[in-house]
Amino acid sequence: RYEKLCELAKRKETIISTIEEQGKMTAELRSRIDNCWDSTELEDIYLPFKPKRKTRAEAARQKGLEPLAIIMMMQRENNLMAKAAQFVKGEVKDEEDALKGARDIIAEQVNEDERARNQVRNIFTRQAIITAKVVKGKEKEEDAAKYRDYFDFSEPLKRCTSHRLLAIRRGEAEGILKVTISPEEDEECTDRLERQFVRGNGECSSQVAEAVKDAYKRLLKPAIETEFSALSKEKADEEAIRVFAENLRQLLLAPPLGQKRVMGIDPGFRTGCKVVCLDAQGTLLHNEAIYPHPPKSEEALAARKIVK
């Protein structure tokens, strides 16, 4: 727990430094970061400011299509094609090319929206299914036999036991299995997102709805799937460690000499010798301290207690 908090604190420092370098830090944003102690929430806060590689949305911005994306998101324009025609220049070939670029920008905005990401997470939490299938051509390999139970496997993620999950992940790491995690119904995710972002049924609204579907399929779903994959493996690892620790505890608590009574002595001078007696099953029968050495030098009393 302490190590995780230290890692989170270091991550906060990096995030704050990056946002400040961009000149986008505000008092409200700084307060949110300072008061956030959940790594997933912290990354959601940072996502809109995270330096990006050359994405489709960034390419569209460089073509000057962000104003068109803003118009589409407002969903008030009644003659969208005429408005899109105003952006046909340079690398933008035609109206459809302009609309496509604007949709890419909207899709990125949907992906970076905290509420949208949390809605998809909630659906994954309730109904995520883990599916494993054998990679074509691998089923006859010698190493594949131990994963035969998972060649065509599907189960709710929240019911998948740790040993099964770890076995599936080993099969994936060895290239035997292809593993996916997804909701039972993708439509519930897209419906929720459309209710959040789409207003009305005009030209702009249909474009936003298309962008929302693209955002979910291309950006949001893969990101949340990766997130749940890591979280589920972490939980499975923790459960495996817990089971191992419990088994080790039982082993260490087992009678050290089998079915025999045992007496153990922890020697000491000033504080005395601590004596413990166990029965044949390792259950505590008696414990007390004796003082055969100086300063008390109760040799005879100590001997009687030992014999008794």
Placement of each model-derived feature along the sequence:
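Catalytic phosphate-handling regions of large nucleic-acid enzymes and associated NTPases
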Residues: 1
